[in-house]
């Protein structure tokens, strides 16, 4: 199977934006979220990674807009941002998305997370946002503001609970065009049988080709954001590169 590419549409107040290292206020705006998502579909995307940054930072929600985006797309949507309890999970799934990403709640409310993994199976992925500090792999929550414990301990717990998929971000790379952390991706993939999706740092077609070399180890896909918006390459070029 070729590497699956998921163009990212990060939403703030209804607009598509990109942040640098997830920092609120660091965004560059790229227009309407609906237009951005439809544009990636038109360019050949099979999946869209749709993120409600207002919900992730706890400052509101773009729920109605997200539902509109999902409704207008013919492709699969992975929805992320602020999914922390039964109400927000139900609202996210009600948009018609194919799956949701749970992040902070997997760290702060492990019992709830274990239950929804059990109830929803393949519809729930867990986002692992990793910061490497003095050689230690620490997880970050609440829009990357809080410490969420040791990556390998949390991964072992979630894996034992049957988590169906992990979305792995090296947050020092996200939005920087600094290249992906291949060692981190391989390390996670080697410790779980669940598929892994890479996020953060992709800057070139060679970066995507490098991630694609990890598919046999369990890396299933890559989320691509800033590189596409900054026109480092087009989505058709990226799709062709990982199919070579």
Swiss-Prot record:
Pathway assigned in UniProt: Amino-acid biosynthesis; L-histidine biosynthesis; L-histidine from 5-phospho-alpha-D-ribose 1-diphosphate: step 4/9; Amino-acid biosynthesis; L-tryptophan biosynthesis; L-tryptophan from chorismate: step 3/5
GO MF term list: 1-(5-phosphoribosyl)-5-[(5-phosphoribosylamino)methylideneamino]imidazole-4-carboxamide isomerase activity; phosphoribosylanthranilate isomerase activity
Gene Ontology, cellular component aspect: cytoplasm
Record keywords: Amino-acid biosynthesis, Aromatic amino acid biosynthesis, Cytoplasm, Histidine biosynthesis, Isomerase, Tryptophan biosynthesis
Pfam families: His_biosynth
List of catalytic residues: 10 (proton acceptor), 129 (proton donor)
Localisation per UniProt entry: Cytoplasm
EC number of the protein: 5.3.1.16, 5.3.1.24
Primary location group: cytoplasm
Reaction catalysed by this enzyme: 1-(5-phospho-beta-D-ribosyl)-5-[(5-phospho-beta-D-ribosylamino)methylideneamino]imidazole-4-carboxamide = 5-[(5-phospho-1-deoxy-D-ribulos-1-ylimino)methylamino]-1-(5-phospho-beta-D-ribosyl)imidazole-4-carboxamide; N-(5-phospho-beta-D-ribosyl)anthranilate = 1-(2-carboxyphenylamino)-1-deoxy-D-ribulose 5-phosphate
Disulfide-linked positions: none
Alphabetical list of InterPro entries matching this protein: Aldolase_TIM, His_biosynth, HisA/PriA_Actinobacteria, Isoase_HisA-like, Isoase_HisA-like_bact, RibuloseP-bd_barrel
UniProt-listed GO biological process terms: L-histidine biosynthetic process; L-tryptophan biosynthetic process
Function: Involved in both the histidine and tryptophan biosynthetic pathways.
Family under the similarity heading: Belongs to the HisA/HisF family.
NCBIfam families assigned to the protein according to its UniProt record, in alphabetical order: hisA-trpF
Annotated protein name in UniProt: Phosphoribosyl isomerase A
Organism of derivation: Mycobacterium tuberculosis (strain ATCC 25618 / H37Rv)
Gene name of the record: priA
């Amino acid at each position: 199977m070729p590497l699956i590419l998921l163009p990212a549409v990060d939403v703030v107040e209804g607009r598509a934006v990109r942040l640098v290292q997830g920092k609120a206020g660091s965004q560059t705006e790229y227009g309407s979220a609906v237009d951005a998502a439809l544009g990636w579909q038109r360019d050949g995307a099979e999946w869209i990674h749709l993120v409600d940054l207002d919900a992730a930072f706890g400052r509101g929600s773009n729920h109605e807009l997200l539902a509109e985006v999902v409704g207008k797309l013919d492709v699969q949507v992975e929805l992320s941002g602020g999914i922390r309890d039964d109400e927000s999970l139900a609202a996210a799934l009600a948009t018609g998305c194919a799956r949701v990403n749970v992040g902070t709640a997997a760290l702060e409310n492990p019992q709830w997370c274990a239950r929804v993994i059990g109830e929803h199976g393949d519809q729930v992925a867990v986002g692992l946002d990793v910061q490497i500090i003095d050689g230690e792999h620490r997880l970050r929550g609440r829009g990357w503001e809080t410490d969420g414990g040791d990556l390998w301990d949390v991964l072992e717990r979630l894996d034992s609970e049957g988590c169906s998929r992990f979305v792995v971000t090296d947050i020092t790379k996200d939005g920087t065009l600094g290249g992906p952390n291949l060692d981190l991706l391989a390390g996670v993939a080697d410790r779980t049988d669940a598929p892994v999706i890479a996020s953060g740092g992709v800057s070139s077609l060679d970066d995507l080709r490098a991630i694609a070399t990890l598919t046999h180890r369990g890396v299933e896909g890559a989320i691509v954001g800033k590189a596409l918006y900054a026109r480092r390459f087009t989505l058709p070029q990226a799709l062709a590169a990982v199919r070579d």
